Every structure is written in structure tokens, then in C-alpha cells.
Amino acid sequence: MKLVNIGFGNMVVSSRIVAIISPDSAPIKRFLSDAKTRNELIDATYGRKTRAVLVLDSGHIVLSALHPETIAARIEGGDKEEESY
């Protein structure tokens, strides 16, 4: 199981991530609103601006303050911030 740091010490299992997308478009904002009403939204931004939306295979949505490119690099590159168990 490989964990990836999505900011502020929060970790997500990398194999469960289906997509990493930018939150700026109107369809994504509606998607986030729907997830919030279903109680499937996890906010890991610590009050910062949301810069990436992670869609998990369980249907949960995770908000991160890191850029999508940063998270993708951590998943692919084996950054120091991630841990393997």
C-alpha cells in the first residue's frame, strides 16, 4: 500500500485515486456540491484555497491545497513526502 501526501500531513492511498482534477470549472463545482450533500466530500485544505480535487474509487471526493501537477509528481516520482507500508 503506497500513501501519497496531499498536503499538511494528509495521506491518501495512491491506488485508490481515479482522477486528479482542477476545481475551476462549473461542472466540477456542481460535482463538489453534490458530493457534499451526499456526505462524500473530504476537505483536506486546512482553510486554504482548493487547487486539486481527487476522485477516489469509493466515490469520495478529497479537496487538496496542492496543485494537481504536484500530487501527480508525488505519485509517479516517489517523492520524499510519501510512505510505503
UniProtKB/Swiss-Prot annotation:
Signal peptide positions (record): none
Domain of life from the UniProt record: Bacteria
InterPro entries hit by this protein: RemA-like
One Pfam family named in its UniProt record: RemA-like
Record PANTHER family: REGULATORY PROTEIN SSL2874-RELATED (PTHR38449:SF1), REGULATORY PROTEIN TM_1690-RELATED (PTHR38449)
Family: Belongs to the RemA family.
Name of this protein: Putative regulatory protein DICTH_1339
